[in-house]
Amino acid sequence: AYREQIGAEPRNRGKSVDDMLLVDEMKRGMAQGNASGKHLIILHTKGSHFNYTQRYPRSFAQWKPECVGVDNKCSKAELINSYDNSVTYVDHFIVSVLDQLRDKKAIVFYAADHGESINEREHLHGTPRKMAPPEQFRVPMMVWMSDKYLENPDHAAAFAHLQQQAAMKVPRRHVELYDTIMGCLGYTSPDGGINENNNWCRWKK
């Protein structure tokens, strides 16, 4: 469901319509049905998409002055302040998600869909690949595994492999996420549905 639909639910009256609503929905989803069974939960966030100032509550307005109003009236410094505030709120959101999963066997993937170019009185993304500056397509990705998940030796070895790749700054791509999610969970596909070459968790025993 869209966050606007979630925000319209009677249980959410008076709450800000932002990404934190998804954390409560995640908790509800895990509690429904077979609470001890397997769950695949996908949270589609607004993150740090423009309008940046609308992505976080006032309590997260750490850097000021902010960009308020239309972006072509905002200075580069104001745009960056609002963007940085939104990133801080994304961090808060991610920690809140992880806090719900620390006592469970869980693995979490996070990926931004694109970056932003911020200039004086303008912000840009979606520039054609051959022309795009690095900040638009080199985006953060994260893989987190709970302590309970890491009790499995194979999971621990896969996570160590991920950490090694991160330390070596091995470049990764969005197109590899499906194969990685399935591979890290231990699924294989003999008919080629899962490309092991794209599996970040792949390691040799």
Can you annotate each of these PLM segments?
Residues A106, A111-D154, I194, W203:
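Histidine-centered active-site microenvironments of extracellular/periplasmic hydrolases
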Residues P57-E78, K148-A160:
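Flexible internal linker/loop segments at domain or repeat junctions
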Residues Y2-P10, E122-P128, A157-Q163:
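Short glycine/proline- and charge-enriched loop/turn segments
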Residues D24-A31, E66-Y110, F137, M142-W144, ...:
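A long, amphipathic alpha-helix that forms part
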Residues T45, Y89-F93, Y110, H114, ...:
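Catalytic glutamate of the conserved HExxH
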Residues Y52-Y56, D99, N119-H123:
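A short acidic (Asp/Glu
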Residues A77-V90, R129-V139, L150-I181, S189-E196:
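A short beta-strand-to-alpha-helix junction
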Residues A1-V68, R173-K204:
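Active-site-proximal alpha/beta segments of enzymes that process anionic O-linked groups
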